[in-house]
A protein has these predicted regions:
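Extracellular/periplasm-exposed beta-strand and loop segments of Gram-negative cell-envelope proteins
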Residues: 36-45, 75-100, 130-168, 172
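Short glycine/proline- and aromatic-enriched beta-strand/turn motifs that initiate or cap beta-hairpins
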Residues: 22-53
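Residues that define the transmembrane beta-barrel architecture of outer-membrane proteins
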Residues: 44-50, 97-103, 117, 167-171, ...
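Bacterial Sec-dependent N-terminal signal peptides
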Residues: 1-28, 210-214
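Residues on the lipid-exposed face of transmembrane beta-strands in outer-membrane beta-barrel proteins
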Residues: 27-31, 50-58, 70-72, 101-109, ...
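Outer-membrane beta-barrel channels and translocator barrels
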Residues: 20, 61, 73, 112-116, ...
């Protein structure tokens, strides 16, 4: 609730100052390397995924801007066969795919480092909603007390699957370089919400993106 109020406050301030801001748009695509952190995240491995989205940037001056974006993002984690834990108990390789719509709202600080080249530092909250995904098991396994036998795929979200929590929220920190209209960035996201009820881990992600500013 606090996170939602903070984002609404930021968006309200944005609307009030739009008349004094320079507005631009961008598209971005890239690679995620996601896993879990926190409770029972031992032995979780990075899983690659894609990320694609659009953003708007409200530039208040040459240094400071606000950038809300909307991404379709593939996250999750992998576990190797033979792992025995409180959440994951696997005699098989496990790959958990979580597909999200993400809304990050970043404050950006821009520093000119060369002709037509800027260093950009960004930070801010994000909200995410799980919209799909499958968990794949190459053998017998148990996730959160749900048992799967043999080679199978089940839904990551929903009562008929792993029953992962759809809602996620967290904090984003990024570093990028602007070469004119070309954007290259590296960021990390740390989730505040557990992926499922109980003693479950949180989402963690490292992202690499390439974008273009209009």
């Amino acid at each position: 609730m606090i996170m939602k109020k903070s984002i609404l406050t930021v968006l309200f301030a944005l609307i009030c100052t739009m008349g004094f801001s320079q507005v631009s748009f961008n598209v971005k695509a890239g690679l995620n390397l996601s896993s879990y952190i926190g409770e029972n995240s031992d032995h979780s491995e990075f899983k690659p995924g894609a990320r694609i989205g659009v953003g708007m940037e409200y530039q208040f001056n040459d240094m400071i801007s606000l950038q809300p974006s909307l991404f379709f993002s593939q996250r999750g984690a992998k576990y190797s066969s033979g792992f025995d834990g409180n959440i994951i108990d696997a005699d098989a390789d496990v790959k958990i795919n979580q597909l999200y719509l993400e809304l990050p709202v970043n404050v950006q600080f821009r520093f000119n480092i060369a002709d037509n080249t800027n260093l950009v530092i960004a930070t801010g909250p994000y909200l995410a909603c799980g919209v799909g995904g499958k968990a794949k098991f190459d053998g017998d396994a148990s996730v959160g007390g749900i048992h799967i036998n043999g080679d199978d795929k089940i839904d990551t979200f929903g009562d008929d699957g792993l029953d992962y929590n759809r809602s996620d929220a967290g904090w984003n920190i990024g570093l990028g370089v602007e070469f004119g209209k070309i954007l290259v960035g590296l960021d990390t996201q740390l989730g505040f919400c557990k992926v499922m009820d109980g003693d479950a881990p949180h989402n963690a992600n490292i992202g690499i993106t390439l974008g273009y500013k209009f």
